[in-house]
Amino acid sequence: VLIKIGLALYDYFGARERVMPRHRFLLKETATKEMPYITPAIVAGGIYHDAKVSQPERLVYELVSDGLRASPKSAAANFTTLISAENGVVGFEGPDGAKFGVRPKLVINAAGPWIDRVNAALGKPTKMIGGTKGSHILVDHPELVKSLNGRMIYFEADDGRICLVYDYHGLALVGSTDIPSDDPDNVRCDDHETDYFIDSLRSLLPKLKFDRSQIVYTYSGIRPLPASNASEPGLISRDHSAPVIEPDSERPFPIIALVGGKWTTFRGFAEEVADKVLTRFGKTRQVSTRNLAIGGGRDYPADDRARKAWVTKYATETRLPAARVETLLKRYGTTALPILREEAGASVTMLPETETISATEIAWIARNELVVHLADVVLRRTTLAIDGALTTGNLAAIASIVARELGWDDARKAREIEAVNIELEKRHNVILQAHPAKRR
């Protein structure tokens, strides 16, 4: 009954600008026919429609890139450390060790689970964040992925927690835990969480086999939830807020902290904060971002007919196979166009142990997408690592391409490869092999 009420409310609140079909509620017999692998212990099921972000790390990059394009006087100081805040000057150290200072009129602290640490570094200790750890695993299970048929199963585990499983680039993404944590620098999916996910899958889908050998990648992060005295993590508000720390005698600028929030609401939250900043400066909004396309979403073909026309047009222009154009459009959106044009003028060579990722596209990313470290390419601009497609061989090939484009010497290239291997093992429980867990 609660699920039915919840789905009805979901439809009600989305009725004004509806773009998705209404929910359907399925009794046990119908639900088990639609999902034959699901446990017969279910009482009923519901179907509702939602959106998903297929490459959140890349979306972050595109937001930064679009911001730079919209405001030519802005700068993206990536991998820069806040080291001081004195006499109204905020000091930073860049990735090359160079130090510089900024005298801000206002600071927006969007550091997520690090918000309190940033506030302290700015001279104002706070306790705004009471984060919880959420872990996920990626499982190579073709039978499960096929049975999902593009759907996500959102279910209650045996202990009452809410979990989910859905198709992510041909793997089954399983999550998530909700464990109090305040250490974002050392978060990882631990053995207990992994066992919990496997046990939950076995309970939900008893006809299928699951074990640790099927896991190709894990990841974990801290939700920047507000500090709370709630007795259970699930009772902590998922709403967002933007508290203001007003200036004082030692800090002449205000700090606006972005507490809470998630991908579901990031555009609305950003709009609210931008309006708050404009109001403080006595200015009014000149441009609405509500319907502004982001990155590769600009001029993206809106339906299958438009998509086919786009692919045909640029396959003809570049003389590349339509399948290649389709692959890059799916991977990068309309940002694929300059990559396609570059491939058109070169001999296209695929990376070792891959079928669809070219040396040309990696070189283009290195030159054009604010790459500082090798990990930017394999963990953030592409999905090579999370897809299980990264190997010792293609990592070395990518490192050579990036080194050539960015002017690294052999010592720097070796350090970057080592750093990627350390991060993969420490944060993602991955030790690279000569062959991919999943070929791309």
Model-identified regions with their sequence ranges:
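Dinucleotide-binding Rossmann-like beta1-alpha1 core, especially the glycine-rich loop
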Residues: V1-E34, C163
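Helix-loop-beta segment of a Rossmann-like dinucleotide-binding subdomain
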Residues: R22, T32-S71, G101-V102, T177-D185, ...
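C-terminal catalytic lobe of FAD-dependent flavoproteins
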Residues: H23, R58-E62, A120, P125-V174, ...
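Short arginine-rich
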Residues: A41-I42, R280-K283, L424-V430
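Helical element adjacent to the flavin cofactor pocket in flavoenzyme catalytic cores
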Residues: G46-L106, I198, R267
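Short, flexible loop/turn elements at secondary-structure junctions
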Residues: D50-K52, T80-E86, G94-D96, L106, ...
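Amphipathic terminal alpha-helices
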Residues: P301, G393-R440
